[in-house]
């Protein structure tokens, strides 16, 4: 009985996570992020899985990435982007949405 309950709970959690990931991707699309990024592959900017891997375990990464998305910049991914800058997304994208997007990327 416990194993069955655990399996049901795990399946429900997976559905919630995939639903959240879908909502996060929709927010990324609406915000214009997918013009330069994708989860798996470099487009203009780095793949988000590569960003997550680079900053894994870095306690200050979230705040730095939020600032990078807000203000834009260049230099961190020059080898990948060929020097193409990250454009600023604030105030066009709300601060709370930028934070959600950064959480999504770092959680990959």
Regions found by a protein language model. Give the residues of each.
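Bacterial N-terminal signal peptides that target proteins for export
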Residues: 1-9
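Bacterial N-terminal signal peptides
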Residues: 8-16
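N-terminal signal peptide c-region/cleavage motif recognized by signal peptidases
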Residues: 18-20
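Short sequence/structural segments immediately N-terminal
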Residues: 28-30, 79
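The canonical Cys-X-X-Cys-His
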Residues: 32-39, 101
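Axial heme c-ligation environment in periplasmic c-type cytochrome domains
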Residues: 44-55, 68-97
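Periplasmic c-type cytochrome electron-transfer domains
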Residues: 60, 90-105
